[in-house]
């Protein structure tokens, strides 16, 4: 029976009961009100008491004033030289260089005006008067005009390298010209009809030296002259002055001809062969 009544009450969704439930929920619980009755009137406006706050602040801030509470961090910036910190020294150096090269710093350093004072003395009794003139030079123009690039000093020593090369070149050219001249002279002599002074030959593979000088004999006569067998009776076969009765190109025949002339058989018919 109790179970059935409980189920009926649970399934009853009438409005008056809901209102009663709402009233019960809206009423504050008794235990909460009892707890609040123990508080002072000042506690309803502030969360913390001012007297207790000072004690808490002193206790909480005690560790801030104590310097020994924190461990000391050892740094070597002031002890070691700047070589052990290349990054910081490099950054500082670059910063100083940029500051020196910046146009703002140049304008600041060169913004001062130069004052020149000229004194003009007069010969009268009034003495001398000084006139001060203030001239402000333009900063950018003074920086640009005042800068002068260092010029390299020219050496005063004589530069004979090119001259020597020119002399050698001209000497080589002159030597080549002389060789050409000698070759042209020999060619001109052949063209003009050089002849052997002994046999009168005009064509020969090589001109040789003779009693009159170099290149005065043909090849055959020059060989005979060098060996000491050049006689008036000797004539090459191709010589234009060759005569079979008086001349020969064989040394043995020339010796026989001379024996006949010495015996007296051909004294009347002998002619000068020289």
Curated annotation (Swiss-Prot):
Keyword Transmembrane in annotation: no
Cellular component terms (Gene Ontology): nucleus
Compartment(s): Nucleus
GO biological process: circadian rhythm
Keyword tags: Activator, DNA-binding, Metal-binding, Nucleus, Transcription, Transcription regulation, Zinc, Zinc-finger
Source superkingdom: Eukaryota
Signal peptide (from-to): none
InterPro entries documented for this protein: GATA_TF (IPR051140), Znf_GATA (IPR000679), Znf_NHR/GATA (IPR013088)
Membrane spanning residue stretches: none
Residues in GATA-type zinc fingers: 190-244
Residue window of motif Nuclear localization signal: 152-159
Molecular function terms, GO-annotated: DNA-binding transcription factor activity; transcription cis-regulatory region binding; zinc ion binding
Location of the region described as Disordered in the Swiss-Prot/TrEMBL record: 1-39, 102-132
Tissue note: Mostly expressed in roots. Also expressed in stems, flowers and leaves.
Family per similarity comment: Belongs to the type IV zinc-finger family. Class A subfamily.
Record function comment: Transcriptional activator that specifically binds 5'-GATA-3' or 5'-GAT-3' motifs within gene promoters. May be involved in the regulation of some light-responsive genes.
Record protein name field: GATA transcription factor 1
Organism annotation: Arabidopsis thaliana (Mouse-ear cress)
Lineage of the species this protein comes from: Eukaryota, Viridiplantae, Streptophyta, Embryophyta, Tracheophyta
């Amino acid at each position: 029976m109790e179970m059935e009544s409980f189920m009926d009450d649970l399934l009853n969704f009438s409005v008056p009961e809901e209102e009663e439930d709402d009233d019960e929920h809206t009423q504050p619980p008794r235990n909460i009100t009892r707890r609040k009755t123990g508080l002072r009137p000042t506690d309803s406006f502030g969360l913390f008491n001012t007297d207790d706050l000072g004690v808490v602040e002193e206790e909480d801030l005690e560790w801030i004033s104590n310097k020994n509470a924190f461990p000391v961090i050892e740094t070597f910036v002031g002890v070691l030289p700047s070589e052990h910190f290349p990054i910081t020294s490099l950054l500082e150096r670059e910063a100083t260089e940029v500051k020196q090269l910046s146009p703002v710093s140049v304008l600041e350093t060169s913004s001062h005006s130069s004052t020149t004072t000229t004194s003009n003395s007069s010969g009268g009794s009034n003495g001398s008067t000084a006139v001060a003139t203030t001239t402000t030079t333009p900063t950018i123009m003074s920086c640009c005009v005042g800068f002068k690039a260092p010029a390299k000093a020219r050496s005063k020593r004589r530069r004979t390298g090119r001259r020597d090369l020119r002399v050698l070149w001209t000497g080589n050219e002159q030597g080549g010209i002389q060789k050409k001249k000698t070759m042209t002279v020999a060619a001109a002599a052949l063209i003009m009809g050089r002849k052997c002074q002994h046999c009168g030959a005009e064509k020969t593979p090589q001109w040789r030296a003779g009693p009159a000088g170099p290149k005065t004999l043909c090849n055959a006569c020059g060989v005979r002259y060098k060996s000491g067998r050049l006689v008036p009776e000797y004539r090459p076969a191709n010589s234009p002055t060759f005569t079979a009765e008086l001349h020969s190109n064989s040394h043995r025949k020339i010796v026989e001809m001379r024996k006949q002339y010495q015996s007296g058989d051909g004294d009347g018919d002998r002619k000068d062969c020289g």
